[in-house]
Amino acid sequence: MSKMTPQEMAQTIGSGLLSFPVTPFKADYSFDEATYRANMDWLCGYDVAGLFAAGGTGEFFSLTPTEVPQIVKIAVEETKGRVPVLAGTGYGTAIAREIAVGAEKAGADGLLLLPPYLTHSEQDGLAAHVEAVCAAVKIGVIVYNRDNAILQPDTLARLAERCPNLVGYKDGIGDIELMTRVYTKLGDRLTYIGGLPTAETFALPYLDMGVTTYSSAVFNFVPEFATNFYAAVRKRDHATIHAGLKDFILPLIAIRNRKKGYAVSIIKAGMKVIGRDSGPVRPPLTDLTEQEIAELTALVKKLPAIRSSQQAAE
């Protein structure tokens, strides 16, 4: 069980960079525990404020409800209290509660509640869903505002009153007006996380709206670049930020946007590039082509910080 209160967890993750480690698979798509343990231990060596086990980049949508707590338990064992471990949960309310309870028992310090599966509902229904998950556990819960689960400011305010362990809000839609209204309504009651794909692109403008942290997928394979970029964001170092966007993030996005599902696949490919092969993505996602991996390799090799990452993998 976690030793952190929901408020302590929220304060901690709001103070630094976050990431969602990939979930390694073997050639037969079974979970590769040894590689996952090695990756988690390696990532903890960098300046990261929280790691989300079995999150979106960790292919939560392709994991079974029993796999999630197993993966969380391993993450907790390998991080050894160095950073908070948060777990993904989602689908319908009953399954989300089941996964949440299992993750809490496995030692998770918090939860990220992903949108319900292919279900559109009114605010009252979304609120009931969030409240049910919050009531099932004592650890902190972060809601992910995205796609078919967009909570409005008034709904969030009501939930914040009823659910003491609702401590975070992750934005995955990029609606500047909505983000502003949410922050204006709830202020410091929640910790705010930037959660758009390749969140580095939006990090600086979001910082000015009270969003002090974001989830970096590229931290998986270029952790030094990711942490240096985050430091530049917090310092509002425009020159360093725009250089990082121009030289790495935007070219990476160009590869990512070629096919649906590549937001996860390109991160797995990046792990292969630096010598930390974490296997294939599970269907229905598809892996990058050899040509695309070659392009990504060339892009990664241009980063000075990648040398130490490659050496660490050897």
Curated annotation (Swiss-Prot):
UniProt key word Heme: no
Descriptive protein name: Probable 5-dehydro-4-deoxyglucarate dehydratase
SMART domains attached to this UniProt entry: DHDPS
Pfam families membership: DHDPS
Keyword presence, Lyase: yes
GO BP term, pick one: D-glucarate catabolic process
Positions of disulphide bridges: none
UniProt-listed SUPFAM superfamilies: Aldolase
Pathway the protein takes part in: Carbohydrate acid metabolism; D-glucarate degradation; 2,5-dioxopentanoate from D-glucarate: step 2/2
Superkingdom, natural source: Bacteria
Highest classification ranks of the organism: Bacteria, Pseudomonadati, Pseudomonadota, Alphaproteobacteria, Hyphomicrobiales
UniProt family annotation: Belongs to the DapA family.
GO molecular function annotations of the record: 4-hydroxy-tetrahydrodipicolinate synthase activity; 5-dehydro-4-deoxyglucarate dehydratase activity
EC number(s) reported in the record: 4.2.1.41
Reaction catalysis annotation: 5-dehydro-4-deoxy-D-glucarate + H(+) = 2,5-dioxopentanoate + CO2 + H2O
Keywords: Lyase
